[in-house]
Amino acid sequence: MKIKVLHMNRDLFEINMAVLEKRSHFIAEKIRKIEIDGTIMSENAQNGMEILCINDRGRKWCLNSSWNPIAASEFFAKRYSIRLYGVYFVFGFSDGRYIRELLKKCDDTNLLVVCEPNLKIFAKACSQFDLQDLLQEDRIIFYFPELEDKEGAFLQEIIDYTRIKLLEFCILPAYDILYHEECERYMDAVLECMRNATVNKETHFAFDRLLPQHMLWHMKHMIFYSNIQQVKESVLKKDIKDVPAIIVSAGPSLDKNIYLLKKAHGKAFIIAVDASARTTLMAGVRPDLLCSVDPNSPDRFFTGLDLDDIYWAGNNWTNPEILKKYAKHIFYYGYYGNTWNEVLQKELQYPFPNVAPGGSVSTEAFMLALMLGFRTIVLIGQDLAFTGGVSHTKGIGDALGDNDEYIKSRQIIEVEGIDGEILQTDYQMWFYKQWFEKAIRFYKDEVRVIDATEGGARIEGAELCTLEEVIQKECTKEMDMYALEEEVPPMFSEACQKKMLKKLKSMRTDITDFEKMIANAIQEQQKILTEIQKEPQDTARTAIALQNLMDDNKKIESNAMLSYISMYAQKEEYALGDSIYADENLTPVQLVEKSLALLKGYQKGAKLFLEDFDQIIMNDKDPINN
């Protein structure tokens, strides 16, 4: 078989790039800049078709069959039973033939998320093969880890609980060996998003209507405050290479070393989580940022504390009552639905800042420190275990009730402590421990993580150090972070604030329009249900009716208001995920009945959303800037 170094077919390459450009200018430009080298070759298979090969580890690896690449691709696709609404996470792109054959088995309800770990392979495939059909295919999402700095955030947009039973991995031949670590990272990221989706389900059920109400309040409130991106821009003007960020969490070991933290003030960026506020402030430490994201963060965390000069970080879930009562300076970030985030981006001329969720206020604080540009992050009070049989720092007091009763109520797991001893933790803290370990692995080239908790569970990948040693070795450069924060203005001028408030209120029309769309869809689908229940059934007419139903539902799914209204219809959406998406044996009548149940959930949700919108957004008597 003839082997040759692959040279660029510039005309074909540019044809493919022109198609890709329409989907992502950023990706197309990055691929155009890739330099061709001799590590990737082309080889003629036995049937004369060209395939890609790569030199790695002292040998040649074929990325498709050296006998018959089409037959091999067809055989690969036959392994997978494609289900309605299935989402397939494919690892590897090769020459595109495997993807093309897999796509042939899919319908309009399916999605392929194709991860190519080596951009050079993709670039050379674009120069060697006509990939226009794949590059413009809406059912394919291309994912390149080399270009994505927020892997979890990207995947979280794709994975939701309703389809959690319909997710499947498809790994191309040779890729699991050539890119074993990258493959594991991809799979771990997907699995973590699935866990997050399950946790989010329980969270939404627990808080129900509270979360969208919080979000609406913040959508209005933020107009008069600053955002965390503004802080980042101010920080980047300074040389912070030798300045660490210290995350102060509320574990029991915080009581051991909090008295030392005052020595780090002005030489580190100190982020305290809300539950650690009392212990931190009582030790004479004024944190540079107080992070609060719990929808039910209790007032007892803050009662009697002097918080007038404290800067807060808040997102769409933060308890508004706490901010109303205690916060005078707020830096916002988070996700406020597609519509409002797009309005913010258009006005600000940059994407509204957000971080990948981790499930706790400590993980949020970690991601904020990373986002702000700090490359040494120190953890204190991050026990992630019941150290000494205690759940939290003494500063919390009775905020969580009796300590022993609280621990007894938890699902207990055993973990290794920093000194090798076995400690008790609960499932929730174990989950956060896993999150930190994954984050440390993922960002290993960007950040150094030091665990100066001096107790608690061992966090794999974090350096162990005492807080005294951290202060001596890492906190050596003076930097007035408070003065830097004081210089950050509100994100909008006074005139722009009025304009943004007007834009926010204009969303009311979108809500009422959505209500009308849902009412019409329900009416039409009730007609369909009546029609297909008639005997004898007309198979052709039933197929047309079901197609019309799917078309109606697609229009509803693409409506921007759905991201808000679905927050009020969580039970209906999750019930749909547990039945219609997972049960392939539903009759046409059952399909329509399930669809109607969901639409009626949306109809109810739209009514509730409009009630909250009028009470929170349209209510001019409610003071905002307090």
Please provide the spans of the model-predicted regions.
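Catalytic cores of enzyme domains
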Residues: A356, A365-I377, Q382-R441, D445, ...
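Acidic, glycine-rich flexible loop/linker segments
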Residues: I158-T162, N315, Y326, Q349
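Active-site/ligand-binding-proximal alpha/beta "capping" segment
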Residues: E321-L384
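Short hydrophobic/aromatic-enriched beta-strand-loop microsegments
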Residues: L111-E116, L135-D138, A268-A272, R286-P295, ...
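N-terminal donor/sugar-recognition subdomains of glycan-related enzymes
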Residues: M1-A245, P252-F269, R278-M282, P298-D309, ...
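Short acidic, glycine/serine/threonine-rich loops at helix termini
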Residues: A125-S127, I258-L260, M282-V285, S292, ...
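Beta-sheet-dominated scaffold domains
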Residues: D294, T303-D306, W317, K324-Y326, ...
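Glycine-rich phosphate/pyrophosphate-binding loops
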Residues: E116-P117, S276-A277, G284-D294, L372-G395, ...
